Amino acid sequence: MDLHLSREQEMLRKMYRDFAENEVKPLAEWVDENEAFPEETVKKMAKLGMMGIYFPKEYGGAGADVLSYVMAVEEMSKVCGTTGVIISAHTSLCCAPIYENGTEEQKKYYLPKLCSGEWIGAFGLTEPGAGTDAQGQQTTAVLDEKGENWICLLYTSDAADDMQ
């Protein structure tokens, strides 16, 4: 087993590290103190392919490997935990389930928008009693009378205003 990084992985790690030091670290304290979402930083990460690192190019991803994704999360997390979690949740909790379990139609519809950063993935664990147990949630959705729209009773905040 070869435990060395490839030349491409070394270059990506340097790019991630430089980006983290130059773009993420200077804002990290402000992000934490203000409980802010670093929207401009996320846009820059998307332009560098960091919002879809290991997904195939045919779905808008960068076409790199999982180790490259892990290195990006690691480098961002070294300087700003929030930014590391943004990449991690977006990729692992939103994009990956679509890529691994979605239909071809779903992959072609959702992944390009997610990998480009046009949409940012999220994952909610908000039910009383569910805590961090995603399987413990009880929320259900039912089709409306016309069979066209799903109805789900939930509480939302301004954070969901831009969600599709």
Regions found by a protein language model. Give the residues of each.
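N-terminal glycine-rich flavin-associated loop
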Residues: 85-105, 131-134
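Short strand-connecting beta-turns/loops that link adjacent beta-strands
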Residues: 145-147
